[in-house]
C-alpha cells in the first residue's frame, strides 16, 4: 500500500468526506492474521510487505533481489546475508541476524501451514555476527534457487521472538505499517510508521473487504475507496466511467477444480481424467473472466513460472470422457465457496459434467471460514473449486499426501525434492490429480489521480 500514489485529494472522485488514508477494496477477507498456522492467501496478501518484510524481495521479473539484506553472497548452497543497518521492528527493537535465524527456525519447528515445506532444504543456520547470517541449503541448484525465491514470500517473513505470541491479533514486523484494527470479514486498518527504515510513509492504510464486486466498484465510484484490487467481475469493466482507470495483470492464481483423491469416485484416476476431458476451460474463461484469464492447459502452473509446460494436457473432449467412464454414472458433490468466480464456474461445471454422465450436486459454503474448516482442514468433500494464489505452490498442493487433495505419489515427491518441478508437473497431470480451469487475471481499478500498484502478482503480497 505504501506504493500507492495519490495525485489528487482523496475522495476527489465522489462526495465522500475527505480522508487522509489510502483505502483498498478487496475480496476474500482473511479469517485471521496468523498465516503460520493455516493456508489461504488473504492474510499474507495484507501483511507481507506492509507489516512483515523479507531478506530478499521478488522483483517484477520474478527474480529475488536484496531487501532487508542489502547484499547476498552465494557459494554453492551456502548463502550469506548481509543485513541493512538501521532496520527496526515496530516496537523499536533493532532487526538482527538473531531475528533472521529465529524466523527460519520458527518456520521449520512451529509453522503448520503447508508452505513450511519450502524451508525443508535448509540444513544449517549460523549467526556470524549481528549483521550477518549464513544459511546452508542442500538439494542441488534447483532446490537452492527455489529456496532463495521462497525467502521473498510469506515463508521468509522476518519475525521476532517478542511478536509470535500475538501473531493472530497484533503482528509485529519491520514493514511500513502496523495493524491498528482487524474486523473479521470486514477490514484491516493500518497505521503508518513514522520510524520506518525505508523512508516516509505518507498515509495510513485501510483494506476493506467486500462480498460482491458491485459493492467494491460502488465504493470506488463514490470515493470510499481509492483502488479495487482483484476485481472479481470483468463484465463490470464496460460499465465504468471513463475516469476510472483499469489495469489487467497476471497472477499466481490457479482456479483449481480439486478432487479428493482419497474418496470415491475420485480415488480412480480414470474418473479424474474423465472430469478433465469433460470440462470446457475456454468456456469457463469466457463466462467467468470475459476471456481475460490465461489457459494453462489444465496444469497448476502460471505462465510466469520457469517450469510452465505450455501445452494442453486435457483438450475438451466429451467423447473421451464418456469412454473413460465406461458407462458409469458417478454421483458427485462439488463444494463451492460463495465467491462470484466460483459460483459462475460451478454452474458451467454442473452442465458439462452432467453431459458426460456424472450426477452432480452443487453445495455452496461460506468462504473463507466454512470452506477452510470443512474442505481445507476437514477434508470433508468430494470435489471443490477455489483459487489457489500462493506462489509456486506445487509442493504444497501435490507434495503432501495429508493435504486436502489427498494426492499421494512418491515419484512426484522425489521429483519435487530433487528440484525437478517440470517432471513433477508432468506426473501430476498424467494422474489428473486436479484440474486448473484458468490462471486468474488480476483486475485493478483506480480512482482518478491514483496510481502505483503493479497489477502483475508475482508473490503473495499486495
Across the structure, where does each feature detected by a protein language model lie?
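Extracytoplasmic/peripheral linker and loop segments enriched in polar/acidic and small residues
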Residues: 14, 359-370, 396-448, 454, ...
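Gly/Pro-rich hinge or "lid" segments in bacterial periplasmic/extracellular proteins
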Residues: 149-200
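Periplasmic binding protein-like
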Residues: 24-25, 92, 351-402, 421
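Structural transition elements
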Residues: 290-324, 339-344
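Ligand-site clamp/hinge motif
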Residues: 193-238, 359
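N-terminal lobe/hinge region of extracytoplasmic solute-binding protein
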Residues: 26-76, 105, 172-173
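Surface-exposed binding/hinge segments that line
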Residues: 73, 78-80, 117-159, 180-181
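Periplasmic-binding protein-like
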Residues: 262-304, 344-345, 424-433
Amino acid at each position: 500500500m505504501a506504493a500507492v500514489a495519490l495525485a489528487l485529494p482523496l475522495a476527489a472522485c465522489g462526495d465522500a468526506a475527505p480522508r487522509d488514508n489510502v483505502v483498498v477494496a478487496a475480496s476474500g477477507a482473511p479469517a485471521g492474521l496468523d498465516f503460520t498456522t493455516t493456508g489461504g492467501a488473504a492474510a499474507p496478501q495484507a501483511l507481507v510487505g506492509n507489516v512483515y518484510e523479507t531478506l530478499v524481495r521478488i522483483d517484477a521479473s520474478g527474480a529475488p533481489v536484496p531487501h532487508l539484506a542489502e547484499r547476498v553472497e552465494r557459494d554453492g548452497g551456502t548463502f550469506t546475508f548481509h543485513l541493512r543497518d538501521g532496520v527496526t521492528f515496530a516496537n523499536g527493537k533493532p532487526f538482527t541476524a538473531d531475528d533472521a535465524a529465529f524466523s527460519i527456525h520458527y518456520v521449520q519447528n512451529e509453522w503448520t501451514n503447508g508452505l513450511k515445506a519450502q524451508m525443508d532444504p535448509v540444513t544449517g543456520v549460523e549467526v556470524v555476527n549481528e549483521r550477518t547470517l549464513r544459511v546452508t541449503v542442500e538439494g542441488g541448484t534447483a532446490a537452492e534457487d527455489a529456496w532463495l525465491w521462497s525467502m521473498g514470500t510469506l515463508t521468509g517473513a522476518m519475525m521476532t521472538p517478542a511478536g509470535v505470541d500475538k501473531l493472530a491479533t497484533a503482528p509485529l514486523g519491520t514493514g511500513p505499517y502496523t495493524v491498528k484494527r482487524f474486523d473479521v470479514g470486514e477490514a484491516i486498518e493500518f497505521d503508518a510508521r513514522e520510524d520506518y527504515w525505508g523512508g516516509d510513509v505518507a498515509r495510513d492504510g485501510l483494506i476493506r473487504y467486500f462480498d460482491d464486486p458491485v459493492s467494491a466498484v460502488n465504493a470506488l465510484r463514490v470515493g470510499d475507496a481509492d483502488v479495487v484490487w482483484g476485481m472479481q467481475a470483468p463484465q463490470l469493466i464496460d460499465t465504468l466511467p471513463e475516469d476510472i482507470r483499469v489495469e489487467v495483470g497476471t497472477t499466481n492464481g490457479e482456479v483449481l477444480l480439486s478432487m479428493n483423491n482419497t474418496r470415491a469416485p475420485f480415488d480412480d484416476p480414470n474418473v479424474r481424467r474423465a472430469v478433465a476431458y469433460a470440462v470446457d476451460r475456454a468456456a469457463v474463461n469466457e463466462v467467468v473472466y470475459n476471456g481475460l484469464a490465461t489457459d494453462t492447459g489444465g496444469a497448476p502452473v502460471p505462465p510466469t513460472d520457469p517450469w510452465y509446460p505450455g501445452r494442453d494436457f486435457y483438450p475438451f473432449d466429451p467423447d473421451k470422457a464418456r469412454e473413460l467412464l465406461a458407462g458409469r454414472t458417478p454421483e458427485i458433490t462439488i463444494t463451492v465457496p460463495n465467491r462470484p468466480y466460483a459460483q459462475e464456474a460451478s454452474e458451467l461445471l454442473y452442465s458439462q459434467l452432467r453431459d458426460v454422465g456424472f450426477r452432480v450436486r452443487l453445495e455452496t459454503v461460506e468462504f473463507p471460514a466454512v470452506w477452510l474448516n470443512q474442505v481445507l482442514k476437514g477434508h470433508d468433500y468430494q470435489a471443490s473449486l477455489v483459487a489457489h494464489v500462493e506462489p509456486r505452490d506445487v509442493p504444497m498442493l501435490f507434495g503432501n499426501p495429508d493435504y486436502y487433495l489427498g494426492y499421494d505419489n512418491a515419484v512426484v515427491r522425489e521429483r519435487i525434492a530433487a528440484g525437478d518441478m517440470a517432471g513433477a508437473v508432468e506426473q501430476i497431470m498424467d494422474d489428473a490429480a486436479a484440474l486448473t480451469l484458468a490462471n486468474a487475471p488480476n483486475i485493478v481499478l483506480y480512482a482518478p489521480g491514483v496510481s502505483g500498484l503493479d497489477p502483475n502478482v508475482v508473490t503473495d503480497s499486495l
